[in-house]
Amino acid sequence: MFSKKWIIVALGAVSLPAFAAVENYTVDPDHTYPSLEMTHMGLSVWRGKFNKSSGKITLDRAAKTGNVEIVVDAASIDFGHEKMHEHAVSADWLNVEKFPTMNYKGAIKFKGDMPASVDGQLTLHGVTKPVTLKINSFKCMPHPMLKKEVCGADAEGDLDRADFGMTKYTDGGAGKIHMRIQVEAIKQD
């Protein structure tokens, strides 16, 4: 009888990690803005952001794993300059008529107890390539108005437009893109 109790306790302890909750979050489109920086003919740095994005994030903090899926409306790019917008959405660059969205799917990597990076695949302009994002900050807290946990992060990474088949106007360093992503996501019940 004594050994039977210990077997039950041991099995229960071993199975506890299997019941660790995977937490699901929905990206808050009002507080999430993928943005980019690139040179304008090597003269200055232009900054733009995408105003429409959606997605989901999963976190398993006990297992120190997670996943990210983000969809960005390519036509929502905003440089604050109409001519630049027209050029960016044209066939010369994003070609939003043919490729209306950009998709990023990746696995979150932890360093200690905190997410540190996302190793993922970006589909842009019909081409899928690996892109790693470094997470510079990450925090979760109960949101005072939503009464739910909300997590926020700032991440960054680099890509070359030519890798995605966008080779027009890449001289002068304009092909190199530095991305910055601010994201907030709301925990789902």
Regions found by a protein language model. Give the residues of each.
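Gram-negative bacterial Sec-dependent N-terminal signal peptides
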Residues: 2-19
